[in-house]
Amino acid sequence: MFVGGDIIEIKYNHPILGSGTLYCKAGEDGTMDRGGFRTADDANAVTGAGEMIVQLNRSLASFETPPIAWDMTDKDELEKINKLAGHPLNADWTITSVNGSIYGGKGRPVGEITGNTNTAQITLKLAFEGEIKKIS
């Protein structure tokens, strides 16, 4: 059986900024790229004799989260995420799914970090060193 579903929580632990938990909006998609090496998709990667030329390049591991719930009056997740993105050290992250699987790695928020004041949601993409590992 194949079981997907909601991300229950995203936890971070930063050596200077401390730890915290982010909660995602239910029923929304998240996209994970576990990273590692990829073979380039190039129609011209072939010799004159027809032998394939294999080009392997490392791909950055990343997770585009479902929208993060934003408590503007108390927890202010947007401020915390911005501080994590702007600090020179990476944090340890874990991503827990409703199906019981937990993934994690060392990384940081990247790209645009915007909060929607109407829906109380934050867009978030995390990038990781090496590969995203399955913890359980």
List each language-model region with its residue ranges:
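Short, surface-exposed linear patches
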Residues: G86-D92, T114-T119, A127-F128
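Short, cysteine-centered beta-strand-loop-beta hairpins and adjacent loop/turn segments enriched
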Residues: M72-D76, K134-S136
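Short beta-strand-to-loop capping motifs
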Residues: P67-M72, F128
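Solvent-exposed edge beta-strands and adjacent loop segments
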Residues: M1-A69, N99-T117, T123
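C-terminal or internal capping secondary-structure element at the end of a domain, subdomain, or sheet
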Residues: Q121-S136
